[in-house]
Each structure stands twice: as C-alpha cells, then as structure tokens.
Amino acid sequence: MILRATFENIYSIKDETQISFVAGKSNAHPSHVSRAEKRDDISVLKAGIVYGANASGKSNVIKAIALLQQIANGNFPQSKVEPFKLADTEEKNSKVEIEFKTKGKCFAYGMEFTVGGIKEEWLFEINSRTDKEVFTRKVTDDGNEFTFGKVDGNEETSMLLKFIAHSTPSDSSFLSEYVRRNGKGLETIRMAKNWFADGLKIIFPSTRLQGISFLTENNDELQETTRSLLAYFNTGISDVRLYKIKKEDVNLSSDLLDNILSKAKNGKTYSMAATVGGEMLLFEVNANGGYEIYKQKAVHRNLTSGTEVVFDLSEESDGSIRLLDFIPMLIDLKQNEVDYLIDEIDRSMHPMLSQKILECYFSGLESGRDTQLIFSTHECNLLNLDLIRADEVWFVEKGKDGASHLTSLAEFKPREDVRKGYLLGRYGAIPFFAPISQLKW
C-alpha cells in the first residue's frame, strides 16, 4: 500500500511535491482504512482518487511512480527520464520516493537520478516514530559509496553484500541487483523488491491486462465470479471463453516464439499470455516443445432462442473491452493483497461505470486484507462524501509557472455538495476558458 509519494523535477512537477494516502482522523467509511494496530503502525487509506484538468499533470503523478517501479525492477529507461523543462532545472537531479506498506512492514524507497543514471538510492524501514536505515547509496565519479544498517550473517555474507554493492552499475538499482545476484544479510531488500515486482500494478489507457479467461480457465469459482460481474456491469456479455485457433492464422515472430518455447521446463506444461498484432493470445506449451494457441472471445445469448452467439473481442466496444480488463483487477483485489494504480479509469467508459467499479471494490474490502486502488479521473460524480472520504481525494493543478501542484480535498474541510463545489472551481483542478467572444476564428 502506498503511504505517500514525493516528486521533484520530474515531468510537470518542479519543486518537491507530495501526495499522501495516510489516513486522517476522520471516522467516515472506516472500512476504507487499514488501521494501525500497534503504537508505531501507520493507518493507510485503501483508495485514492486524483482529479485535474487536461494537461494538469495528474497522469504524471502515476507516470513518475511507474518510472520508479521500472528502475527498481532493474530497467533504467533513459527515454522516460524527463526533468521539468519550463525552468532552469534540466541539469538538476530528478527525485522520486515512495513510502509503502507490504507484509506488515513500512518502507521508504527512493532515488535521485538524471538521464545518465542513478545518483542516489536509499531504502529505510519506517514507522510512525522512527526511520531505520537499510542502505544508502551515492554514485560518484569513482563509483558507488554505500552505508548499510544492520546486516545479518557472517563475514562471507558481508563480503558478498559489499561486492554486489560496489559492482552495481549506475543505470541499475541496488534493489534489483541484490535480488538478481542472490544477496544475503538484508532480507528487507527482497521484501521491498517483491512489492515493486508483484505487489504494485499500474494500468495506463494503453495497457492490456491478461485476459479474464486466461485467469479463470479450469477454476469454476472464478468463472462464476466473472459471469456475475459481467451481468452486474450490464455488458450484454454472458461469458468470456478460450477458443483454440490455427497456428497459421497467427503472424508470430520467431523471437517471440523462441521466448515462449523456452519457458517450458521440468517436463511440465507451461502457459503464458502475449500480445500479438494487438490481440492477447494464450500459448500453452508442453514439455516436448509442442504448443497450442488460444484466444478469448465474448459469448452473448440470443434473447429469442436462448442460444449462444460468439463474438471476437474486436467486435466489442472500446468500453466493453476496457471493462473486461478491469474485471481481473477486481477479482485480484478481492482475493490478494495487491495495490493498483490506474491512469484515466473512465477512458472509453460510461461515467456511471467508474462509480460502479469503485462501489464494487469497496463492497469487497475486508479489515484483515491490505489492498489499495488509486486512480485518476475526470468523473465528478464520484465526489460524493456518501461514497468516499475527503482525504481520499487529491486535486492536481498547474500554476502560472507551468508546474503541477497537488492539494487534498481534506484541506478544504468540505461540508457542502463537493461535486457542485468542484464544478464551480472552489478546489481548482478544472479548466478555465476565456469568453467565446474572444475566440478569433
């Protein structure tokens, strides 16, 4: 779960800016909060909503978190490192830090970097009162300089740790190198890395999730849950199933095929999903190198005869396909401790669907399970304090300097109709236009 994120000199964010999902003192919607159980614990919100006008920078908040995730996982994408360009800050370091909770522990992981690579990197174990260093890294012309907190193990463990530390290249995170080279002595690093790799899932408008039928195949309970959600969202789709297709009908590159076939190990059948020609396909590989290809299709029911009619997903609307991407997410959130960030949740969908997705998520919350759903949106009907808490809402607005600024709805202490107040511009984060009479065209 994300507690807070801090950004500086990245994308449209100039000065140090913070977004927080630490729960305030409000007693509203108690199920929306993972409450602190011990004195040093931190209470965290299970939902977050980010509003802003077009080009306000709300997507950049999620992009910056995604960038840190990518670097933490071992991939430094130079093309995605973009410092703030509307001031003399392009030569300064960019900074992103995330404080997060996983497996009952809270961490602060962050770094400073330029297009050329990482300049500083750190990981601390934190609670409401203290910070405990795991490691701090500074990259100089002479290489890496490290300090470590308590290291468990013998001298051999310590020597391996130092070797990994000093041989970590500037375009790679120590977090990923420690795990890749099977480091020992600082197991909290592995816990933090696992959260970035498996616990944090980010969805952009162009992201295609693994299809519903790929996840529910051979699982009757999940199939029933999927059919229930399809009916609830009134898609007209009664089911989504896998259908075998001919290999000659798939334009499959040799590199992708080699990658797929290489996954079969230990005499076991292996399945993996891959996007080919814009379509999500499932490849089932046996131990002998043979394989079959499947695609998912939507099943409708003829209302007159009751017979099933099968449609390619290309025949479905963009909104239906977008919704089909979100159903696996809702199932994942209900069953596992995972955190989802979605950019523009309402893209291609009816405004009411965003509300229903949020209501569906809230209905499945359980006090003992730490999950989190954070998304950006324009949908003002969600600004309803009967549905959400004020501290779950953030507004992003650009100032006169072109830089994005973040403000929490809780700072306004709203009591009135929040939706109406937002549309009237009381909280900012909406577009303002000159009178149409001034338009020269």
State the predicted function of each range.
Residues 1-70, 293, 297-436:
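Switch/communication elements of ASCE P-loop NTPase nucleotide-binding domains
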Residues 33-55, 59-118:
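Conserved P-loop NTP-binding catalytic core
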Residues 78-82, 277-280, 377-379:
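Short Pro/Gly-enriched beta-strand edge/turn motifs at strand-loop
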Residues 108-263:
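Electropositive, glycine-dotted interaction segments
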Residues 208-315, 426, 437-441:
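Extended helical coiled-coil dimerization/tether regions that scaffold
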